Amino acid sequence: MTFVTCDLCDDNADSVCVVTGLNWLSYGGRDAFGGEIVTVKCFEDNSRVKEHLGTDGKGKVLVVDGGGSLRNALIGDMIAENAVKNGWEGVIIYGACRDVDALAKLDIGVITLGCVPIKSVRRDEGQLNIEITFGGVVFRPGEFVYADNNGIITAPKALV
């Protein structure tokens, strides 16, 4: 999948939403990725992130509302490796990751607010496939998200 979010915005100005007001950092081996939105809402518990990334993710991006917490990581190298094996295009986390040197070597996009070496606590909590909001955008399961070094955008239909 080849695209530039700037061009997607220019060509679809009436239908895209741009995530704003957050300083995202890219840690994965892919600079650009996109696909159908799948959502998880959790706070400092990556049980649902691990669960979802263990399923078939071909053509999909997991978007996680982690409440913006940077106190512990919601994804690290082992979960990301499993996501690659299951065909996920990428992961966008309103929260933190860890194992950043290993993430950079994986063929997957990983965008988060930052990194921290502390792992998540697993309490088997979190919600799947619900509307979540951060960065001024509502992420709806079944819609589409595209991310590159220019930013993150959403659209109600596939643009690529």
UniProtKB/Swiss-Prot annotation:
Substrate binds at G76, D77, M78, I79, R98. It holds the Pfam family RraA-like. It comes from the Bacteria. Divalent metal cation. Its EC number is 4.1.3.17, 4.1.1.112. Keywords: Lyase, Metal-binding. One of its GO terms (biological process) is regulation of RNA metabolic process. InterPro entries: RraA, RraA/RraA-like, RraA/RraA-like_sf. Signal peptide: none annotated. Its cofactor is a divalent metal cation. GO terms for molecular function: 4-hydroxy-4-methyl-2-oxoglutarate aldolase activity; metal ion binding; oxaloacetate decarboxylase activity; ribonuclease inhibitor activity. It is an enzyme of class 4 (lyase). NCBIfam families: NOT-MenG, PRK09372.1, PRK12487.1. PANTHER family: 4-HYDROXY-4-METHYL-2-OXOGLUTARATE ALDOLASE 3-RELATED, REGULATOR OF RIBONUCLEASE ACTIVITY A. Homotrimer. Belongs to the class II aldolase/RraA-like family. Catalyzes the aldol cleavage of 4-hydroxy-4-methyl-2-oxoglutarate (HMG) into 2 molecules of pyruvate. Also contains a secondary oxaloacetate (OAA) decarboxylase activity due to the common pyruvate enolate transition state formed following C-C bond cleavage in the retro-aldol and decarboxylation reactions. This is Putative 4-hydroxy-4-methyl-2-oxoglutarate aldolase. It comes from Alcanivorax borkumensis (strain ATCC 700651 / DSM 11573 / NCIMB 13689 / SK2).
